[in-house]
């Protein structure tokens, strides 16, 4: 009986923690393909694939504006941070995602173990060359420190750095939408379904960055599931 109760408690804790760190679910309008699908079977013809050069060409002659970036699996490959957090705070479980001690570790130093994604380097360099304003909006729980802001500023050589916006997450609302709208962001780059919907709800374009196939954040999203444009070779 005690074993059964412990098992039920563990399952409920995992469900609760996952629910606390996920967006609402919006049904897709297209088939969509995960990064794993696209790596093994090639680029599907029914997904709108674009490159950084394509975006740069589209924006020629347009005045500078604000663009936004998600952090985890979009700007940084941060699986090492989350894997370490799970091992330390809730081995084989997900309750660490509701533990402020984990977020303080992640936000106040462990991000140094995150790897910058090449696609983020290319996008940020292109937008800065245009004079666009760069914002980082994450679904993470915030901490009383400025490490992630400084790390991103140094890693991507941000000229006019804004503090990272910690929007948190919710199962009942898209928490990033108001920040995208309030900062008049026109393009928001993200790997999650919620990033695409948040951008659209704010009147911006959400462009999909492919989540790496070996990310600890599973299941891997279906790229193109909302008919959004997807960046080529953006899984790394």
Swiss-Prot record:
<dbReference type="InterPro" id="IPR023214">
    <property type="entry name" value="HAD_sf"/>
</dbReference>
<feature type="binding site">
    <location>
        <position position="176"/>
    </location>
    <ligand>
        <name>substrate</name>
    </ligand>
</feature>
<feature type="binding site">
    <location>
        <begin position="138"/>
        <end position="139"/>
    </location>
    <ligand>
        <name>substrate</name>
    </ligand>
</feature>
<feature type="active site" description="Proton donor">
    <location>
        <position position="72"/>
    </location>
</feature>
<protein>
    <recommendedName>
        <fullName>Class B acid phosphatase</fullName>
        <ecNumber>3.1.3.2</ecNumber>
    </recommendedName>
</protein>
<feature type="binding site">
    <location>
        <position position="70"/>
    </location>
    <ligand>
        <name>Mg(2+)</name>
    </ligand>
</feature>
<feature type="binding site">
    <location>
        <position position="72"/>
    </location>
    <ligand>
        <name>Mg(2+)</name>
    </ligand>
</feature>
<keyword id="KW-0732">Signal</keyword>
<feature type="binding site">
    <location>
        <position position="191"/>
    </location>
    <ligand>
        <name>Mg(2+)</name>
    </ligand>
</feature>
<keyword id="KW-0460">Magnesium</keyword>
<keyword id="KW-0479">Metal-binding</keyword>
<dbReference type="GO" id="GO:0030288">
    <property type="term" value="C:outer membrane-bounded periplasmic space"/>
</dbReference>
<dbReference type="InterPro" id="IPR036412">
    <property type="entry name" value="HAD-like_sf"/>
</dbReference>
<dbReference type="InterPro" id="IPR005519">
    <property type="entry name" value="Acid_phosphat_B-like"/>
</dbReference>
<comment type="subunit">
    <text>Homotetramer.</text>
</comment>
<keyword id="KW-0378">Hydrolase</keyword>
<dbReference type="InterPro" id="IPR010025">
    <property type="entry name" value="HAD-SF_ppase_IIIB_AphA"/>
</dbReference>
<dbReference type="GO" id="GO:0003993">
    <property type="term" value="F:acid phosphatase activity"/>
</dbReference>
<dbReference type="Pfam" id="PF03767">
    <property type="entry name" value="Acid_phosphat_B"/>
</dbReference>
<dbReference type="GO" id="GO:0046872">
    <property type="term" value="F:metal ion binding"/>
</dbReference>
<comment type="similarity">
    <text>Belongs to the class B bacterial acid phosphatase family.</text>
</comment>
<feature type="signal peptide">
    <location>
        <begin position="1"/>
        <end position="22"/>
    </location>
</feature>
<comment type="function">
    <text>Dephosphorylates several organic phosphate monoesters. Also has a phosphotransferase activity catalyzing the transfer of low-energy phosphate groups from organic phosphate monoesters to free hydroxyl groups of various organic compounds.</text>
</comment>
<keyword id="KW-0574">Periplasm</keyword>
<feature type="active site" description="Nucleophile">
    <location>
        <position position="70"/>
    </location>
</feature>
């Amino acid at each position: 009986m005690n074993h059964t109760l412990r098992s039920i408690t563990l399952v409920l804790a995992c469900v609760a923690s996952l629910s606390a760190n996920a967006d609402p679910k919006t049904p897709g309008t297209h088939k969509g393909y995960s990064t794993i699908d696209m790596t093994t079977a090639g680029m599907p013809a029914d997904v709108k694939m674009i490159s950084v050069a394509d975006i740069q060409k589209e924006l020629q002659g347009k005045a500078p504006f604000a663009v936004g970036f998600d952090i985890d699996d979009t700007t940084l490959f941060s699986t090492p941070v989350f894997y370490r957090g799970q091992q330390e705070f809730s081995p084989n479980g997900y309750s660490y995602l509701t533990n402020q001690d984990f977020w303080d570790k992640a936000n106040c130093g462990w991000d140094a173990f995150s790897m910058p994604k090449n696609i983020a380097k290319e996008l940020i360099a292109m937008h800065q060359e245009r004079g666009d304003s760069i914002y980082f909006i994450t679904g993470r729980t915030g901490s009383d420190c400025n490490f992630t802001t400084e790390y991103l500023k140094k890693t991507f050589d941000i000229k006019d750095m804004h503090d990272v916006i910690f929007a948190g997450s919710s199962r009942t609302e898209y928490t990033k939408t108001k920040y995208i709208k309030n900062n008049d962001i026109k393009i928001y780059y993200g790997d999650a379904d919620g990033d695409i919907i948040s951008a659209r709800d704010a009147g911006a374009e959400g462009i999909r960055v492919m989540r790496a196939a070996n990310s600890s954040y599973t299941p891997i999203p279906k790229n193109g599931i909302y008919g959004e444009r997807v960046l080529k070779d953006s899984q790394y």
